[in-house]
A protein has these predicted regions:
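Long, compositionally biased charged/polar stretches
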Residues: 1-568
Length: 568
């Protein structure tokens, strides 16, 4: 292999290796000139690529403010918006509330006519079973967890929930059996709400208990809209007036929207993805096997995040003008969410075990995520075994050890309690971490991003903000004024335009070394088996949000065509 010398351009650049190029570890470099070149390459990259603190207490980002600084190999082409937005004319300037659900329905019919899942959401969003279904299989399946104890700050009693449990059972027995689940949005406690259209909007930090019934359906049984119990913070129940109960669920869905966008989506996949990408560029030479393995999955994160910070998360962007938590609350939300982040929560088998999701027979996200993780893990292990011939090779790879320390420092902010490794001692430790990186930046991102239009297109199902404060008493809400809590017309349009743009995958993929084709074919084989297994869910109560259907739109092509070189 000839020596490739980087020119002194002013942008960050990576080079895709040709099909007959050599990929190797530093210890395998036999030519002194090549070893010296690796050192020189990394010195040059570290001078060009630096770190920047975007928000104190959150993962760091690349020190670049313009996409033009990235160069052609770290940017990508975006397809046109996925839906026709001409119908928004006449709506985008209306800084007023929706007049009725009928007006919303007319608006939606223009918008959702080609989205069968969105139509299904509109038809069933009021139903308790569908509320529980979304917690498991919607665009944010990362909040639900099994609980064996009622939170001490939730004013729920056994007698209160008795009508919603099996006839011969008690709350204590259901907790012991593992059929009680919890949504807790305490990260929103005390977060100031946004001012939109010169009007104060409102947030809540609800707690919601759900029960897995004998038919296998997960249904909400109690909702408390604020963290601190008291006479002005009642516990809403399914037996309450219909509009009271529906409004309580809408408040939960609004809180979920905030946590989904900033924690599940932006933090876990985008910000951490940027950390993985920046660390890879700074610490791994382009002939390192992990550079070649990881870069197809992470290279677009820099462009996406730079654009997000310059538009979506900037003054006059959608977070400033249309989202309940707003720009002023961004530091609190991201720093709090980062403090709660752990390495275990990013690793699918550990996360599912910790949240007790194996007990949910219709949690298709859990089932699919575990299968995709397992296939990815086998795939990564085979690639690791191609280049590392034992644990000692892992320990002695100084480039690899610098890479993981950089991630620990700038991604997990040197917090030992995060559980992020500071070094790798074994091939299995390395395989697990690399699997996590690929899963987070491909399959997980597909699950929390590409299903947004399915579940958020009917806005009352996932309101981005609320224009009236949470109710402090029961019996004050009617069908006629329920919609008055929802965001204004123009902010609704802003959110939908943004979600439409975010729901479109990148258009280009890379071609890579044919050395890996045999390993990739094994991965494809296990992936196809999984696609077949998801087809047996016709008895499910709703179209499965199945991770794999979403994964095929983004991580499927990315995992498969980029490594085999068979894509467009």
């Amino acid at each position: 292999m000839g020596i490739w010398v980087c020119n002194h351009s002013s942008y960050l650049s990576i080079k895709t290796l040709s099909l007959n190029s050599t990929v190797c570890l530093l210890s395998s470099e036999s030519e002194l000139k090549l070893r010296d070149h690796r050192v020189t390459e990394m010195q040059n990259k570290k001078q060009k690529i630096g770190w920047h603190v975007f928000i104190e207490g959150a993962p760091h980002c690349v020190d670049a403010s313009l996409v033009s600084q990235l160069g052609p190999n770290l940017s990508y082409a975006r397809q046109s918006p996925g839906i026709n937005l001409h119908y928004l004319r006449g709506f985008t300037e209306r800084a007023e509330s929706w007049r009725s659900f009928e007006e919303l329905d007319t608006f939606f019919r223009h918008n959702g006519r080609e989205n069968s899942i969105a139509k299904y959401v509109q038809a069933h969003w009021r139903e308790d079973w569908f509320f529980g279904y979304q917690c498991q299989n919607g665009c944010n399946p990362l909040m639900i967890r099994q609980t064996r104890l009622i939170p001490p700050n939730m004013a729920v009693t056994s007698d209160m929930l008795r009508p919603f449990l099996p006839e011969t059972s008690t709350l204590e027995q259901e907790l012991e059996k593992g059929t009680i689940f919890l949504l807790d949005y305490e990260v929103l406690e005390g977060v100031p709400a946004n001012v939109i259209n010169d009007r104060q909007h409102y947030l809540s930090a609800p707690l919601c208990l759900l029960h897995l019934d004998q038919q296998g359906e997960l249904k909400p049984v109690a909702i408390q809209l604020q963290q601190n119990p008291g006479p002005q913070n009642p516990v809403f129940l399914p037996s309450d007036p219909v509009c009271d109960w529906l409004l309580a669920k809408m408040w939960v869905r609004c809180a979920d929207f905030q946590c989904h966008q900033l924690a599940s989506h932006f933090l876990r996949t985008h910000l951490l993805g940027e950390v993985y990408c920046t660390a890879t560029l700074r610490q791994l030479p382009e002939v390192h096997p992990l550079f070649q393995l990881l870069m197809p999955h992470i290279r677009t994160t820099l462009q996406i995040n730079i654009q997000a910070r310059a538009s979506l998360l900037a003054p006059n962007g959608v977070f400033d003008k249309a989202i309940g938590c707003g720009l002023a609350s961004l530091p609190a939300m991201l720093s709090r969410s980062s403090a709660r982040l752990s390495y275990r929560s990013l690793c699918v088998p550990d996360d599912l075990e910790d949240r007790g999701l194996a007990a949910l027979p219709r949690c298709y996200y859990a089932q699919d995520a575990l299968r995709v993780w397992s296939a990815l893990h086998r795939f990564v292990l085979r690639l690791v075994e191609l280049y590392y011939h034992g644990d000692q090779c892992v320990e002695q790879d100084t480039e690899l050890q610098s890479w993981i320390m950089e991630i620990y420092t700038h991604g997990f902010l040197q917090k030992p309690q995060s559980g992020c490794p500071q070094s790798f001692q074994t091939m299995m430790e390395l395989t697990k971490f690399v699997t996590m990186v690929i899963f987070s930046c491909s399959a997980l991102h597909a699950a929390v991003n590409f299903s947004q239009m399915d579940f958020d297109l009917w806005m009352p199902n996932c309101p981005a903000s609320m224009t009236r404060p949470p109710p402090q008493t029961k019996g004050t809400v009617t069908e006629d004024n329920l919609f008055s809590f929802l965001p204004e017309v123009n902010s609704t349009c802003s959110v939908l335009i943004t979600l439409s743009m975010l729901s479109v995958p990148a258009a280009d993929y890379s071609r890579y070394d044919h050395t890996h084709v045999h390993t990739v074919h094994k991965f494809l084989s296990s992936s196809r088996c999984h696609c077949v297994s998801t087809g047996s869910r016709s008895s499910a109560p709703a179209p499965p949000a199945g991770l794999w259907r979403k994964c095929r739109q983004n991580s499927g092509p990315l995992l498969m065509t980029s490594l085999t070189g068979t894509g467009n």
